[in-house]
Design a protein with these regions (language model features):
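A recurrent flexible, glycine/aromatic-enriched loop bordering the glycosyltransferase active site
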Residues: 2-4
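Specific transmembrane alpha-helix
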Residues: 8-26, 41-92, 115, 131-156, ...
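Active-site-flanking alpha-helical
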Residues: 19-20, 186, 227-232
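Membrane-interfacial entry segments at the cytosolic side of transmembrane helices
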Residues: 29-37, 92-106, 200-201
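Central hydrophobic cores of alpha-helical transmembrane segments
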Residues: 34-44, 110-111, 162
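Alpha-helical transmembrane segments of multi-pass integral membrane proteins
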Residues: 73, 103-225
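Membrane-proximal cytoplasmic C-terminal regulatory module of class A 7TM GPCRs
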Residues: 162, 225-237
Length: 237
């Protein structure tokens, strides 16, 4: 199931790239009055389908199915469309410069707490709910806010340009592909050694994250970059 998650994700990405040109053109060229009703009907249908399943992993299989992952991609394009609009630019500028330092500090803290809440919900919530719409609103808020605070006043605007975070950002794709497998491996090892003792959960998380970063670095250096260079050379011939 862990490996299936990564392979399904790659399938979703390939499927999206094949239709990106047409999907992007449709969303950018049409008005919100056309886009929002169509997308809303699609989202409601997907949510109803997720909550109608009762068997284990059924909601997960539906979640990974490429046509339903189009919802995430559509939301991303819609967010870009809004960000480029006059209203989006005004809101972005207000977030960056139109609030005081204290307001920025509080807002940054709320965003971090939102991420922590989403993490806890992802672990403990019902799969039908988790696979339906858990990440839609939070992802939109997080992406828009992160882009807007590039020159902001809050502590996140000073933390995000950090060299370590920049370095990790270059491996974000590999980290995403590896994290489920690496965390599961470390979890199985610690369960055998320590049982379900929650006092070791913090150490387990640190080891799992370190293992994920290590595997991401190895795969990018010895697989991703060499493969990319070979394909680039073939394409240039």
């Amino acid at each position: 199931a862990v490996l299936n998650g990564s392979t399904w994700f790659l399938s979703d990405i390939i499927f999206f790239y094949l239709i990106f040109k047409y999907l992007y053109r449709f969303i950018i060229r049409n008005s919100w009055r056309t886009i929002l009703p169509i997308l809303s009907i699609y989202m409601i249908g997907y949510i109803l389908l997720c909550f109608s399943t009762t068997k284990d992993y059924s909601a997960g299989y539906i979640y990974f199915y490429p046509p339903f992952r189009l919802i995430d991609f559509c939301l991303g394009i819609c967010l870009y469309k809004f960000y480029q609009s006059t209203k989006g630019q005004k809101l972005s500028e207000k977030i960056a410069k139109g609030i005081s330092c204290w307001q920025a500090f509080i807002t940054d803290t709320i965003i971090v707490l939102m991420i922590a809440t989403m993490y806890e919900l992802a672990i403990h919530s019902n799969p039908n709910f988790r696979c339906a719409a858990l990440y839609w609103l939070s992802s939109i808020i997080l992406v828009f806010y992160t882009v807007s605070i590039e020159n902001g006043k809050g502590w996140l605007s000073y933390l995000l340009p950090n060299k370590i975070l920049f370095w990790l950002g270059n491996y974000s794709f590999e980290i995403y592909l590896w994290h489920m497998l690496c965390f599961r491996i470390i979890q199985s090892i610690t369960l055998r050694i320590y049982g379900e003792d929650i006092s070791y959960s913090g150490i387990q998380f640190i080891i799992s994250l370190s293992f994920t970063i290590l595997m991401s670095w190895i795969s990018k250096k010895y697989i991703v970059i060499p493969t990319y260079n070979k394909l680039k050379n073939i394409a240039c011939k």
